[in-house]
From Swiss-Prot:
Gene Ontology CC, one term: ribosome
GO BP terms: translation
An MF annotation (GO) of this entry: structural constituent of ribosome
Entries under HAMAP family matching the protein: Ribosomal_bL28
Family as reported in the entry's similarity comment: Belongs to the bacterial ribosomal protein bL28 family.
Pfam families: Ribosomal_L28
Top-level taxon: Bacteria
Protein's name according to its UniProt entry: Large ribosomal subunit protein bL28
Keywords: Ribonucleoprotein, Ribosomal protein
Keyword Zinc on entry: no
Length: 78
């Protein structure tokens, strides 16, 4: 299973780790993904999905249905 948010598509970011002596090495910054069981009101069922915490905050603010519509996601396929 890949480390990708199922709703927003958030994935890892390539960054640099910089030491005190300014030696730079490549570093992978993973997305903060959580497994959550979210209630889908329109479909009247629970959805078990891997979602990033920033997406969870947006879902709490907007709601699952409106967020999925804004992203163009069909929740019936999840």
């Amino acid at each position: 299973m890949s480390r990708v948010c199922e709703l927003s598509g958030t994935r890892a970011n390539n960054g640099m780790a910089v030491s005190h002596s300014h030696i730079r090495t490549k570093k992978l910054q993973q997305a903060n993904l959580q497994k959550r069981r979210l209630w889908w009101e329109e479909g009247k069922k629970w959805l078990n999905i891997r979602v990033s915490t920033s997406t969870l905050k947006t879902i709490q603010k907007k709601g699952l249905d409106s967020y999925a519509k804004s992203q163009g996601i069909d929740l019936k396929k999840l």
